Regions:
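S-adenosyl-L-methionine
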Residues: 1-70
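Conserved proline-anchored active-site loop of SAM-dependent methyltransferases
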Residues: 60, 77-94, 98-105, 111, ...
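SAM-dependent methyltransferase catalytic-core segment centered on the flexible catalytic loop
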Residues: 267-349
Length: 434
């Protein structure tokens, strides 16, 4: 390696420690292009269901390579905010065991579906049976579906009836849980296109002029798409994957078992995942009220404790942000404080999950609200240092091909207006060993 290349590599990284954590100019780090774009086209399995702010698939493989360079022998990979299972799939494709959790049942449904290999003949067999039942006699609708105010708000009556018939057909026909997940994932993925939900809008918004799609045609199209994805999947039928529908903060771990944790925590003042996935939550009967999943959701603007309880728990980086926000917006300051306290608790929990000699790779971005920089990356790095992690290295990557609007208006709301502040064009990778 040339001296020049050594210098460039060094400058793309920054080692953080307790002495420089508050002064390090992490925003001045040059973009590390090697962590910006993958060399291999992502698997079709990553497109079986829409999901906001998807984790870049190639980062998991690069994280495994990086850990190997650091002398870490990786057998088990974990993602404690597993979302739709991007890290899960990539870990299994690299023949590693996987452990993941997420509070959102829609997310874990998608993740479980990605982590399995399916028999094409079984898919076709079940599909034929579902079709036969769907086009057979009429059904008497469950009162929950025909009178649910949220379902009636989002769907026209004929769509409600057809979706109910399809759901009932899937439940009646599919016997194995593995294939039930597959068909429920397909069902979930067509709900927005069959509803009044504004096309291409991530957040809930009615389009009164939207031409809704035919339920059966959309389902057929989605099953074909998922069949093609399954045929190209690199996941083997027998694999070691465990995915739990619960918060990382509620995990009961007897002893550390993970060699490498790869995850992207939620951002405060960003998405309310419970709201975004409300159609699937309602139709799959995960809860009669989607707002239930706001409780315990890290990064949610709801259910924050009083500032008097949270402020004393904050590290210096977190306290600095909260105090700046407090003078501008007390409600947001309260939500940010809760998020930072939760993330500090997450780092403590990670110490019970990742074994000594193991490592973590976090992908996290900073946000901005009413001209206050929400320095998530620095807060996370300080949290890691305070819990005894070492070799805390930070890089900066450019965001590409992500379902994320990179602009906010003057009030901090998402906007497609390029004259607004661009705050999501880059994000940070934080590597830390324990």
């Amino acid at each position: 390696m040339s001296i020049q290349y050594q210098w460039l590599t060094k400058e793309r990284n920054m080692i953080l420690n307790i002495n420089n954590i508050h002064t390090a100019e992490i925003d001045a780090l040059p973009i590390d292009e090697t962590w910006t774009m993958g060399e291999v086209k992502p698997s079709l399995m990553h497109s079986i269901h829409a999901y906001p702010a998807k984790f870049p698939p190639f980062i998991t493989t690069k994280a495994l390579q990086y850990a190997k360079q650091q002398g870490i022998d990786v057998h088990t990979v974990a993602d404690i905010f597993c979302g739709c299972g991007t890290v899960a799939y990539e870990a299994l494709a690299n023949r590693k065991s996987f452990f993941g959790c997420d509070l959102n049942p829609v997310a874990t449904l998608i993740a479980r579906t990605k982590c399995r290999k399916y028999d094409s003949n079984e898919i076709k067999k079940y599909f034929k049976r579902i079709k036969k039942m769907f086009f057979s006699d009429s059904v008497d609708m469950d009162e929950y579906f025909c009178k649910n105010t949220r379902i009636c708000y989002w769907f026209y009556p004929n769509q409600v009836y057809d979706l109910y018939k399809l759901r009932s057909s899937i439940i009646s026909v599919v016997e194995l849980d593995k294939y039930l997940d597959f068909f429920f994932c397909a069902f979930s993925s067509i709900l927005k296109s069959c509803s009044k939900w504004l096309t291409k809008s991530i957040k809930p918004q009615i389009d009164p002029r939207k031409q809704t799609k035919d339920v059966w045609e959309e389902f057929c199209r989605q099953i074909c798409k998922m069949e093609r994805a399954n045929e190209s999947s690199e996941v083997v039928e027998e694999n070691n994957a465990k995915i739990l529908t619960q918060s990382v903060l509620d995990l009961n771990i007897n002893e550390p078992f993970v060699d490498l944790l790869v995850t992207s925590p939620p951002y405060v003042t960003s998405y309310e995942y419970a709201d975004i996935h409300q159609l699937s939550t309602l139709w799959l009967d995960y809860s009669p009220d989607y707002k239930h999943f706001r409780t315990g959701s890290i990064g949610s603007l709801y259910h924050s404790d009083d500032l008097r309880f949270n402020v004393p728990k904050l590290n210096q980086s977190g306290l600095s942000v909260v105090m700046q926000m407090y003078s501008i917006d007390k409600k947001q300051a309260k939500a940010i404080a809760q998020y930072y306290v939760n993330m500090q608790a997450v780092v403590k929990k990670i110490c019970n999950v990742v074994r000594k000699g193991g490592a973590c790779l976090f992908v996290i971005g900073n946000t901005e609200y009413k001209s206050v920089k929400i320095d998530n990356a620095r807060h996370l790095a300080e949290s890691l240092l305070n819990e005894g992690f070492y070799n805390v290295t930070i890089k900066r990557r450019k965001i590409l091909n992500k379902i994320l609007t990179p602009y906010r208006d003057k009030n901090g709301k998402f906007s497609s207006d390029k004259t607004s502040r661009k705050i999501y064009s880059e994000e940070f990778l934080i590597f830390a060993q324990i």
